[in-house]
Amino acid sequence: MGKKKIHKRAIIVPDIHFPLQDDPAVEVVLKAIKMVKPNIFVCLGDLGEWKSVSPFKYKRRRRPPLEYVIEDLQKEVDAVEKGLDRFDKVLKSVKCPEMHMIEGNHDNWLNFFVEEYPYLKKFRFENAMHLAERGYKYHPYGKYLKIGKLYFYHGGHYTTTYHTKQHA
């Protein structure tokens, strides 16, 4: 007898950018999860927009006092968690056994912020989103996720117009 093939169903979702998400698109994905009942769910990075800690927000100006930044950041964390709750609810309802969170370049901005303020570890992406408690396998920015013969990677390293101009 031949080896029995195992078929897995997966849903891969890139670049949601909560709280700036496209709600109709999110609803379509949530319906797809209900229909497909995936064995695997992969968030392919940029779960949040993280405008409050964007390296571009204060490019030519000084950042305001930390207490103002933290207030904005906490609001953004709450909004992104609320968005992730929507996915978690549906994934739990279909009993999805394997969930992966790949850190995107926007998500990594939280880590850069914590590098500046090491006593704020609760704002590291993995911690702020409570990924372990939610049941996600966390994959840091720049690391590949391999499932079977497939590799998953966020990228985002060459997204500037400078790179395009240099390689056109």
What do the PLM-derived regions correspond to, one by one?
Residues 1-2, 31-32, 161-167:
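Short, flexible, glycine/charge-rich loop motifs used to bind or transfer phosphoryl groups or to couple energy/partner
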